Amino acid sequence: MITKTTRWPSPAKLNLFLYINGQQENGYHELQTLFQFIDLCDHLTITSNQSGQITLAPDIPGVKTEDNLIWKAATLLQQHSQCEFGAHIEIEKILPMGGGIGGGSSNAATVLIALNFLWQLNLSNDTLAALGVKLGADVPIFVHGFAAFAEGIGEKLQPATPKELWYVLIKPEVSIATVDVFTHPDLVRNTPKQPLNALLEATYVNDCEKIVRSVYPEVDYQLSWLLEYAPSRLTGTGACVFAEFNSEKEAQDVYSLIPDNATGFIARGMNTSPLNRTLEEYKSLCKI
């Protein structure tokens, strides 16, 4: 066990496009989507110990410890590996909850990667991803750490290299539950599957966007505002919307115009997760 206190990034993701191709008998939706990381991150400071307990600080308002994906991921890893070690995890929360940028899933993946290293379990990323998918369909993308085209229910990943553009994100003052979007009777569920090359060359679309804009006027308002300046879309099932730019200056210029009552961020697209880089840095330090 490595007892050193370590600090780990937990990055957000964007769905650059999202198409829903059908629905399985178990209720899960078949989809095609393109994931890319952005350099907007929560951070987790983790200290492993021999207590066997998983403790978190600070509490997240409205979220019980046993419902927190950070605690769930650590406990799941303990149980799977029969590890008797524990950890104290401090959370620096930047990513908005209910935003469609993968905050909870990313936190879970960061815990799996970090504790696998700190507890010296030596589990493969495939094993960690298989554990992670029990916590959420997006967790494997954060475990593997590369931008990817995803199919199936999101578990079939193919590495991809979309342009690493600059983005302006706005988080409307609503929190959207994924289940509410995917169970909406008017959701498009029959977009024909297409080869990746065709999807990459087409105009990017999110099949959830029409429903979300109709049900949540605040999302519609913010997305309409962004569309005045650049190509813009919903990410995931929302509520975050984003506009894409070729340069940081273009993004900064539009970001400076965001209304005072809106919560916004500037971020850079990343095809390799910063979590991967941090893990490699800690591995190198341990060899010295």
UniProtKB/Swiss-Prot annotation:
Its EC number is 2.7.1.148. One of its GO terms (molecular function) is ATP binding. ATP binds at residues 96-106. The active site is at 13, 138. It comes from the Bacteria. It catalyses: 4-CDP-2-C-methyl-D-erythritol + ATP = 4-CDP-2-C-methyl-D-erythritol 2-phosphate + ADP + H(+). Keywords: ATP-binding, Isoprene biosynthesis, Kinase, Nucleotide-binding, Transferase. GO terms for biological process: isopentenyl diphosphate biosynthetic process, methylerythritol 4-phosphate pathway; terpenoid biosynthetic process. The keyword ATP-binding applies. The keyword rRNA processing does not apply. Pathway: Isoprenoid biosynthesis; isopentenyl diphosphate biosynthesis via DXP pathway; isopentenyl diphosphate from 1-deoxy-D-xylulose 5-phosphate: step 3/6. It holds the Pfam family GHMP_kinases_C. InterPro entries: GHMP_kinase_C_dom (IPR013750), GHMP_kinase_C_sf (IPR036554), GHMP_kinase_N_dom (IPR006204), IspE (IPR004424), Ribosomal_Su5_D2-typ_SF (IPR020568), Ribsml_uS5_D2-typ_fold_subgr (IPR014721). Belongs to the GHMP kinase family. IspE subfamily. Catalyzes the phosphorylation of the position 2 hydroxy group of 4-diphosphocytidyl-2C-methyl-D-erythritol. NCBIfam families: ispE. This is 4-diphosphocytidyl-2-C-methyl-D-erythritol kinase.
